[in-house]
Amino acid sequence: AGNAGLVASLGAGRVIDYRLEDYAKSTERYDVVYDTLGISSFREARSVLTRTGRYVCPVLGFGLLSASLRTAIIGGRKARFSATGMLKPEVQRAMHAKLVDLVEADRFAPVMDRTYPLAELVEAHRYMETGRKRGNVVVV
């Protein structure tokens, strides 16, 4: 699909369109499964992760929270919630410095989908919930 092509163009090693392929049934093994929409689960991803693989998702729900806590204690495969704001300040500073370097080198190209005025915040949120966004949705 269109988003799969976009993700591949951003440098992903392998992109799976969840509407066409059930990655959990794959015989391939992955170091990272990054679930951008939060439609999968660590339980589903576990079978395709390498021994030290990571399932990463920016959408925190009870299942991911439970799996993150459980896998922090046991096992090689890990479930992780990904949110920049939860990182240590020194890690955030290093990430921001790298981002500044990329911008200054003209190597940073954010993908912008739509911009909404603040008065249309509800519409912006509805659009994001469709799962069809192709980049950042900005509210100004």
Residues of each region from the PLM?
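Terminal helix/beta-alpha structural elements that buttress the NAD(P)+-binding lobe
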Residues: 1-140
